[in-house]
Amino acid sequence: MLDDRARMEATKKEKVEQILAEFQLQEEDLKKVMSRMQKEMDRGLKLETHQEASVKMLPTYVRSTPEGSEVGDFLSLDLGGTNFRVMLVKVGEGEAGQWSVKTKHQMYSIPEDAMTGTAEMLFDYISECISDFLDKHQMKHKKLPLGFTFSFPVRHEDIDKGILLNWTKGFKASGAEGNNIVGLLRDAIKRRGDFEMDVVAMVNDTVATMISCYYEDRQCEVGMIVGTGCNACYMEEMQNVELVEGDEGRMCVNTEWGAFGNSGELDEFLLEYDRMVDESSVNPGQQLYEKIIGGKYMGELVRLVLLKLVEENLLFHGEASEQLRTRGAFETRFVSQVESDSGDRRQILNILSTLGLRPSVADCDIVRRACESVSTRAAHMCSAGLAGVINRMRESRSEDVMRITVGVDGSVYKLHPSFKERFHASVRRLTPNCEITFIESEEGSGRGAALVSAVACKKACMLGQ
């Protein structure tokens, strides 16, 4: 009898592993993804192929990295997900001539109707938050330079002018796509009329992260975010940036690699769960690479895998609760919590019981394996992108061994218990002639935007504007 039960358990385990095996990517797969990513990056940089390239490689007009001599008070805004942050950044000389960057900030959550209403509603809400923040800090009377971290695909015409190409990450505010975002912000501030601001720079969160980390480590020339979405930027040789005139020096390029796969480059790796997540998203067929990696989708992928295991009678006695059948019910933070479980399964039990389930010990272990499969694939898929960027940089600089630092931010990278380790190990396997240091950015987006503003202000002063 016991033998039968043990045999049944073993068979069940085998079937579960068979289903989860689809998530495993071999090194050859990752090399394939990496070389396709590099090809698309190349197409994005070239004038004649830029238009149809899935990876847009957008020039940011951030050319110089800050030198540590810009001082003053800056306001910084950060819009990139469901939370919006306003930050006051004091940039100055610390003790012993050291550089100091001090910050105060406040988070505001963005109501659904502002995310999906009109651009005017969204930017009016943003200027209301700024007004509230300035009141709290008695700063209404000051006209501060403002740096705006805006984490969506933007075609820059200058450091303070950029056209929104398309919304991502669940935003849908009408009347913003195709328009200058800085202009929309300036208009909203003017409409409000109770404070003045000088918007000097708009940057992507990857750029802000890179600049922020550059202060810690002067070899930081790549910025990456793995949070709600996933994206990276890096310093590219100007001669390769065909969309901007001039061949001297380097410019930071925002890859917008989340859109990789839009032209079918990932089709052979997409599973039924990926297709279901994509079909029920606000932007079907777009941002496919990001949908494999980003925190906005990870929990939902796990939920769909769990439902598949229930259907196959391998989990929860073949019965799913109403909650488990509800889209979005398995949150991405649950994935981190399940994988952080110490082994007594208490954390896993708690999460599953809030979803109306009464799991056995074996069920808990299967749920953990499902989470590990989805998050490990995300880490490996992400590593192929970064390895593509770093190998490209090494080749274009003709260095035998390249030392480089990558500044990273984002909730998945920072909060998931094993993402980092799996990701680092995989990147290093794919970049044999590179010595890579990873550093986490602290308050990266806000601080980085303020530092970019500081550079912009300094340049404006030098140009006598």
Curated annotation (Swiss-Prot):
Pfam families the record matches: Hexokinase_1, Hexokinase_2
PROSITE patterns: HEXOKINASE_1, HEXOKINASE_2
GO biological process: calcium ion import; carbohydrate phosphorylation; fructose 6-phosphate metabolic process; glucose catabolic process; glucose homeostasis; glucose metabolic process; glycolytic process; intracellular glucose homeostasis
Protein residues bound to substrate: S151, F152, T168, K169, N204, D205, N231, E256, E290
Induction per the UniProt record: Up-regulated by endocannabinoid anandamide/AEA.
Binding sites annotated in the UniProt record for ATP: 78-83, 228, 295-296, 332-336, 411-415
Catalytic activity reported: a D-hexose + ATP = a D-hexose 6-phosphate + ADP + H(+); D-fructose + ATP = D-fructose 6-phosphate + ADP + H(+); D-glucose + ATP = D-glucose 6-phosphate + ADP + H(+); D-mannose + ATP = D-mannose 6-phosphate + ADP + H(+)
Spans annotated as Hexokinase small subdomain: 67-203
Subcellular location: Cytoplasm; Nucleus; Mitochondrion
Transmembrane segments: none
Catalytic class of the enzyme: transferase
Gene Ontology CC entries for this record: cytosol; mitochondrion; nucleus
Pathway(s) it belongs to: Carbohydrate metabolism; hexose metabolism; Carbohydrate degradation; glycolysis; D-glyceraldehyde 3-phosphate and glycerone phosphate from D-glucose: step 1/4
Keywords linked to the UniProt accession: Allosteric enzyme, ATP-binding, Cytoplasm, Glycolysis, Kinase, Mitochondrion, Nucleotide-binding, Nucleus, Transferase
Disruption phenotype: Embryonic lethality caused by the absence of hexokinase activity. Conditional deletion in pancreatic beta-cells causes severe diabetes shortly after birth leading to lethality within a week. Deficient islets show defective insulin secretion in response to glucose. Conditional deletion in liver leads to mild hyperglycemia; however, mice display pronounced defects in both glycogen synthesis and glucose turnover rates during a hyperglycemic clamp.
Gene3D superfamilies noted in UniProt: 3.30.420.40, 3.40.367.20
Signal peptide bounds: none
Record entry for activity regulation: Subject to allosteric regulation. Low glucose and high fructose-6-phosphate triggers association with the inhibitor GCKR followed by sequestration in the nucleus.
Coiled coil: none
Region (Hexokinase large subdomain): 204-443
The family this protein is said to belong to: Belongs to the hexokinase family.
UniProt function note: Catalyzes the phosphorylation of hexose, such as D-glucose, D-fructose and D-mannose, to hexose 6-phosphate (D-glucose 6-phosphate, D-fructose 6-phosphate and D-mannose 6-phosphate, respectively). Compared to other hexokinases, has a weak affinity for D-glucose, and is effective only when glucose is abundant. Mainly expressed in pancreatic beta cells and the liver and constitutes a rate-limiting step in glucose metabolism in these tissues.
Quaternary structure annotation from Swiss-Prot or TrEMBL: Monomer. Interacts with MIDN; the interaction occurs preferentially at low glucose levels and results in inhibition of hexokinase activity. Interacts with GCKR; leading to sequestration in the nucleus.
Protein name as annotated: Hexokinase-4
Naturally occurring in which organism (per UniProt): Mus musculus
Gene name linked to the record: Gck
